[in-house]
């Protein structure tokens, strides 16, 4: 198996060619958060929580889909990355239905955990309801299910 040499947060690593940045980081025990990623099923980089900084890249890249290259230098927690993840979480919450206290996943929710980790502390984000949301719970569930179904169909070439 061909290997490539990279650095993640200054740590030199040798990882299989063709690996994604996320796979390389996990191999090294480095956590990169994800919300939408599911190995071999949903690798589309849609949520953008897994963004990382690659030296000489013009923009942040999604670690779950971006392949490693020989000599690549990656930073998973630079100020730029942390700011982008926080902004992404804030945008997600701006359209969130905010029924977290009555949700079956309350306190076992990756979104809540990430908001705490990244200092998104808007108390209203986890209480009450979003009166501006045009979607009721049934419509929202259908929309999420449809989005996941379409992603899976694309991955499975159905």
Regions found by a protein language model. Give the residues of each.
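Eukaryote-biased recognition of intrinsically disordered, low-complexity regulatory segments
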Residues: 2-9
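A generic secondary-structure micro-motif detector
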Residues: 11-12, 101
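N-terminal cofactor/phosphate-binding cores enriched in small/glycine residues
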Residues: 13, 17-62, 66-70
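Fe-S ferredoxin-like electron-transfer domains
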Residues: 48-52, 57-150
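Single conserved hydrophobic/aromatic residue that forms the stacking wall/gate
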Residues: 148, 155-158
């Amino acid at each position: 198996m061909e290997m490539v040499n990279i650095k993640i947060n200054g740590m030199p690593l040798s990882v299989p060619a063709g690996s994604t940045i996320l796979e390389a980081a996990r191999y090294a025990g480095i956590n990169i958060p994800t919300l939408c990623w599911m190995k071999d099923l949903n690798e589309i980089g849609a949520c953008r929580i897994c963004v990382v900084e690659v030296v000489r890249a013009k923009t942040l890249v999604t670690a779950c889909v971006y392949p490693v290259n020989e000599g690549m230098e990656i930073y998973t927690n630079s100020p730029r990355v942390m700011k982008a993840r926080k902004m992404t979480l804030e945008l997600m919450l701006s359209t969130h239905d905010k029924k977290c206290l009555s949700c079956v996943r309350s306190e076992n929710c990756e979104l809540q955990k990430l908001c705490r980790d990244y200092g998104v502390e808007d108390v209203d984000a986890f209480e009450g309801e979003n009166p501006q949301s045009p979607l009721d719970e049934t419509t929202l569930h259908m929309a999420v299910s449809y989005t996941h179904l379409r992603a899976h169909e694309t991955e499975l070439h159905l």
